[in-house]
Amino acid sequence: MTDRLHIVGGGMAGSEAAWQAAQQGIDVVIHEMRPTVGTFAHQTGNLAEMVCSNSFRSDDDEQNAVGLLHWEMRAAGGLIMSAADAHRLPAGGALAVDRDPFAETVTARLHAHPRVSVTAEEVTELPRDGHWIFATGPLTSPALGAAIQAETGAEALAFFDAIAPIVYADTIDMSRAWMQSRYDKGETEEERTAYLNCPMDRDQYEAFIDALLAADKTEFHEGETATYFDGCLPIEVMAERGRETLRHGPMKPVGLTNPHQPDVKAYAVVQLRRDNALGTLYNIVGFQTKMKYGAQTAVFKTIPGLENASFARLGGIHRNTFLNSPTLLDAQMRMKSRPNIRFAGQITGVEGYVESAAMGLLAGRLAAAEIQGRALPEVPQDSAMGALIHHITGGAEAKTFQPMNVNFGLFRPVDGLKGGRRGRKDRYKAYTDRAKEAWTSWLAEAENG
């Protein structure tokens, strides 16, 4: 029994941790409370269900930090990346996936693995014995959250996350909208036409901003403050920061030409991205919102091309919980006060599907090695994996710790390279070349250790 690894939570991190440990020869039990106990955001009992966007963001492994993380996870035989690649949708230079088949594939492969078992039960305490990884994500249950708070002696940290709406494709007016990826990015025609675009002139944009600002919004409970992760700000919060903010953010009109009016430059553009392989659903890019349902329908139908739109899902808001990991976790993601317990995924203060799965990958491998009595080399800080784990387990300032996406700002500088915008391309290539070499060497040492 003591050699079995228990993983609490079957999201991105928990699924990847289970796969990695099982592939190392460890018997794994996944404790997933769904569907017995549901959450605000989840709709199924599948493992690795995508509840927000369907995008894994950029797949460029030379000029983008998250693309580099994709590369490192593929090199490590990652389940999440394998399933994402199998259910990839056209999205320009991004990696977007068909969310339901993706989750079904992850679920099926874990259920089929001879060393993995899955049990539908809620874990509400921090066990004192055995080997555990808690990957309960931002929607950690109240009972478990209370147990973590009691153990750490500190209030759980939290921010608010918002979900974008999804539209039925056949209700979009294509006499006003058109298909084009920004700057025609992509190697195939399908990639170059991966986004659906709805243009606005200045008057339409100003009216849209007015409607956003006036719309009814979800109220917070007493004692809750509206702290958001910057990468997932509700559009109405962005609008409150300035009337031009959206036009320089998700509604920027650059790199696009309207074939219906090729000589007219749009003042702003709303983009929609395909949400499933059939092309029957599109999500509105960057339009996560906390508006009430009635207000959402009214406001979004003012967008040219969406006047008669029907919504498969409206947006919403939920509270996300995360640990002050620099204070509570050691360099191997173990709880300092309970070293038999590791944490992984979004609850550790990384933000995003890919980052969560990446920390699950490391937690699974680290736990497997510990159970087998093997000492793994330190994860190289020059890799994307190493930059992330270093940040959450000590590199970040504990007093101001907030959820973080992977980015090149977490990487150590490369000597002798020009700073600023002019040197950025060479600098990013140097980061990714160095990272790939470091990660490849670590994997080889880890396998032979």
Swiss-Prot record:
Give yes or no: UniProt keyword Methyltransferase: yes
State the family it belongs to.
Belongs to the MnmG family. TrmFO subfamily.
Name recorded for this polypeptide: Methylenetetrahydrofolate--tRNA-(uracil-5-)-methyltransferase TrmFO
NCBIfam families the UniProt entry points to: gid_trmFO (TIGR00137), PRK05335.1 (NF003739)
The molecular function terms of the Gene Ontology recorded here are: flavin adenine dinucleotide binding; tRNA (uracil(54)-C5)-methyltransferase activity, 5,10-methylenetetrahydrofolate-dependent
The Enzyme Commission number assigned here is: 2.1.1.74
Compartment(s): Cytoplasm
Q: Which residues bind FAD?
A: 9-14
Top enzyme class of this protein?
Answer: transferase
Instruction: Tell me the organism.
Output: Ruegeria pomeroyi (strain ATCC 700808 / DSM 15171 / DSS-3)
Q: Which GO terms describe its cellular component?
A: cytosol
- Where does the UniProt entry say this protein principally localizes? cytoplasm
For this protein's source organism, the top of the classification is: Bacteria, Pseudomonadati, Pseudomonadota, Alphaproteobacteria, Rhodobacterales
**Cofactor names:** FAD
Q: Which Pfam families does the UniProt entry name for this protein?
A: GIDA
Q: InterPro entries this protein is in?
A: FAD/NAD-bd_sf, MnmG-rel, MnmG_N, TrmFO
- What is the documented function of this protein? Catalyzes the folate-dependent formation of 5-methyl-uridine at position 54 (M-5-U54) in all tRNAs.
One of its GO biological process terms is:
tRNA wobble uridine modification
